[in-house]
């Protein structure tokens, strides 16, 4: 395959290699991995530049056909939290330029991920005079608005984001909510912002029969199971789910409030820093254990620890319903993963979740920080098997129709071509995709 078009994918803290385990991996890692692979399948050569976090990491890894991961030295070769990396970005920029000289490689376009890589991208644009596409994955103003004093982002973040928005050639928003943030909060030119939603690997995340999935993961219950998969962070508000389950348990002995009581419900948490649930390594697990004990539902709450991506379909499928109720979520891949596994989702009506989850069709939207509302919707789904099945099928169909990585790569390819060959490309609308909010 002729790979004459070469892309520099910048992702300073989120390497696709992290998906193999050993360090925390989130949505940005998945995005970088899947988009680079799918762009390579379309004929691009993609080099993913990330920061070396261990002396044992080689400089270049042949990650997939047409994709290399380049580990650049910027500061000590050790893991650091992403909010501690900002002072190392000039060294990252310099290491990129040195790699170009040493490898004698030239790039047609730079694709920045996150605000720090965006800063590197515009620094390189000034030196190399090549176009830049930027995706933020999360915006500083929105994070500060929701997290307030507990926001650990560097003080320069919002100023740098504004500079990036002014200077790059195109901005990718993952949902209409993010498009509005870029245009209304930061003053981005509307025709510079393109909506290209992220996606899910619909082969890796596929339905497994419930009983088979429970046997596979060793979950010994025939009763209803609520599953949460994801990071154990305060902004994910997993404590909200514990409180909602406690409300259901409290009402289990009465028929006055909701009609027929539910059988005992199991709440399964999948995630954390280690494969075995460890409240020292993952403090939020300890908080959840204490809260469950305080509310008298310790025996109903189980922790699976961190699991590899290819195992997650069994955990989603073991559940009757998946729940994610963060009070802040830029996009959120876990609702799509659950939907791909044919499970209805109850999610907070925030950020990208309001875009991916179709209220009343693929699940339900609920207000954040509202355990009674969540308990109401949990009861509705857990007490109505036919409703669960109908919503689960609609969820899977929506993913197959709108949220595949090949579709993301196709839309990104259109964007690249419009920048690289404007005289040959059709005019690109400011929103590549206006997604149907109807089934």
Regions found by a protein language model. Give the residues of each.
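N-terminal subdomain of nucleotide-sugar transferases
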Residues: 1-69, 436-439
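Conserved donor-binding/catalytic core segment of Leloir-type glycosyltransferases
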Residues: 220-236, 242-245, 268
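Short alpha-helical donor nucleotide-sugar binding micro-motif in glycosyltransferases
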Residues: 306, 314-319
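Aromatic "clamp/platform" in nucleotide-sugar-dependent glycosyltransferases that forms part
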Residues: 327
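Conserved acidic donor-binding segment of nucleotide-sugar-dependent glycosyltransferases
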Residues: 359-360, 364-371, 380-385
């Amino acid at each position: 395959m002729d790979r004459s078009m070469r892309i520099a994918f910048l992702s300073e803290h989120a390497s696709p290699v992290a998906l193999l385990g050993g360090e925390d991996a989130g949505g940005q890692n998945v995005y970088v991995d899947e988009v680079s692979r799918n762009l390579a399948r379309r004929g691009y050569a993609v080099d993913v530049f990330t920061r070396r976090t261990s002396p044992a990491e080689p400089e270049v890894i042949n990650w997939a056909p047409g994709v290399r991961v380049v580990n650049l030295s910027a500061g000590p070769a050790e893991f650091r939290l992403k909010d501690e990396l900002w002072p190392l970005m000039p060294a990252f920029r310099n290491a990129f330029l040195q790699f170009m000289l040493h490898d004698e490689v030239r790039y047609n376009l730079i694709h920045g991920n996150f605000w720090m890589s965006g800063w590197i991208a515009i620094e390189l644009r000034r030196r190399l005079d090549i176009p830049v596409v930027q995706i933020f994955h999360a915006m500083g103003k929105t994070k500060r608005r929701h997290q307030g004093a507990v926001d650990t982002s560097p003080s320069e973040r919002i100023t740098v984001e504004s500079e990036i928005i002014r200077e790059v050639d195109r901005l990718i928003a993952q949902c209409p909510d993010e498009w509005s943030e870029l245009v209304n909060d930061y003053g981005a030119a509307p025709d510079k912002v393109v909506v290209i939603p992220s996606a899910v690997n619909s082969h890796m995340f596929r339905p497994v029969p419930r009983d088979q999935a429970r046997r596979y993961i060793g979950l010994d219950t025939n009763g209803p199971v609520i599953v949460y998969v994801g990071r154990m962070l305060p902004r994910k508000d997993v404590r909200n789910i514990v409180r909602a389950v406690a409300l259901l348990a409290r009402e289990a002995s009465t028929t006055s409030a909701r009609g027929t009581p539910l059988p005992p419900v199991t709440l399964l948490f999948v995630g954390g820093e280690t494969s075995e649930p460890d409240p020292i390594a993952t403090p939020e697990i300890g908080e959840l254990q204490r809260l469950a004990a305080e509310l008298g539902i310790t025996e109903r709450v189980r922790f699976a620890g961190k699991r590899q991506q290819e195992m997650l379909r069994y955990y989603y499928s073991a559940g009757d319903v998946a729940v994610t109720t963060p009070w802040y979520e830029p996009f959120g891949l876990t609702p799509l993963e659950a939907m791909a596994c044919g499970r209805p989702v109850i999610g907070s009506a925030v950020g990208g979740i309001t875009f991916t989850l179709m209220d009343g069709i693929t699940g339900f939207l609920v207000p954040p920080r509202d355990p009674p509302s969540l308990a109401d919707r949990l009861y509705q789904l857990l007490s109505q098997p036919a409703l669960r099945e109908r919503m689960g099928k609609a969820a899977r169909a929506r993913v197959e129709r709108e949220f595949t990585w090949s579709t993301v790569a196709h839309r990104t390819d259109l964007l690249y071509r419009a920048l690289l060959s404007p005289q040959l490309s059709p005019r690109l609308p400011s929103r590549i995709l206006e997604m149907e909010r109807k089934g």
